[in-house]
Amino acid sequence: MEQFEATSVEQAYLRWKEGKTALVDIRDPQSYEAGHAPGAFHLTNSSLHTFMQQTDFDQPVMVMCYHGNSSKGAAQYLLQQGFDVVYSIDGGFEAWARSYPQDITSESR
């Protein structure tokens, strides 16, 4: 795959429920701590190396941001780092929270 794929929040949710994809959240630390999808890896410049060590490059990766814009650049970057299949989630966390409020956790819970 040379280009990331955009995926709807519904498709992303189904992939996430199957447990076969890695889900990364690239929002700022305060937003991530306030609420994120359970099991989402908080991907930052400082955590990128850890993520790359812990994740198989042939495992699909889904990237979530605020609204589905910043995730596109991050998804393309992950492809350039060698990940085989990367998705950018359309609508980002905003769409996830609106569609699946029951599947949000926070660091304070």
Swiss-Prot record:
Catalytic activity: thiosulfate + hydrogen cyanide = thiocyanate + sulfite + 2 H(+); thiosulfate + [thioredoxin]-dithiol = [thioredoxin]-disulfide + hydrogen sulfide + sulfite + 2 H(+)
4Fe-4S among keywords: no
GO annotation terms (biological process): glycerol metabolic process
Enzyme Commission (EC) number: 2.8.1.1
InterPro entries named in the record: GlpE_sulfurtransferase (IPR050229), Rhodanese-like_dom (IPR001763), Rhodanese-like_dom_sf (IPR036873), Thiosulf_sulfurTrfase (IPR023695)
Entry keyword annotation includes Cell inner membrane: no
Sequence similarity: Belongs to the GlpE family.
Role: Transferase that catalyzes the transfer of sulfur from thiosulfate to thiophilic acceptors such as cyanide or dithiols. May function in a CysM-independent thiosulfate assimilation pathway by catalyzing the conversion of thiosulfate to sulfite, which can then be used for L-cysteine biosynthesis.
Name of the protein in its database record: Thiosulfate sulfurtransferase GlpE
